[in-house]
Amino acid sequence: MNYSYQENGSKVLLTNGFDTRLNTFHDLQLRWNLSKLFNVRISSVLGRKKNASDYAAGRNYFIDYFETTPVFSYQPSSAFRIALNTKYSQKENNSELAEKATIRDVGIDLRYNQVKKGSFSGRFNFINIDYNASLNSSIAFEMLEGLKTGNNFTWGLTYQRKVAKNLQINLNYNGRKSEDSKTIHSGGMELRAFF
């Protein structure tokens, strides 16, 4: 069992005034090894996000949130792991509109490692979101984590390989699909040098 409390904040002076952000939360994590092959992890977070902008009143929010994330993992060897995960979140903005979001997320993660060569990982998630306010606002973007109400799908692939003694290449691909929206694909490549 692990408990932590964090308070992360920033205040930036822009040409039109200050932009202040604050995120405080309590995080409780439990891990239980059912056997050598199976384990369960549960994380619960209770927190508050605040944003105050001098120049854009539409960017002001004060969100109370709760989320719990159970993960069931199967790892038959050090080279392979598969995990089934869920996440349930509730968020509420303390304003006149009282925006509320409920997010249900179910997914699967795979990881395969080859010693001295590289690793491959993939994930797929189904996310259902209920939201009671307008989608075209910065508050909605923050509360819905960039997704839309209704059913959403997200997925990703990552390949990481050591190409030389001090060089590593990372290839990644991410996709997402929301109801009544086109599929969005993005990818990237990164080359790292270690000195």
Language-model-detected regions and their locations in the chain:
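Exposed, low-structure sequence patches enriched in small/polar residues
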Residues: 1-195
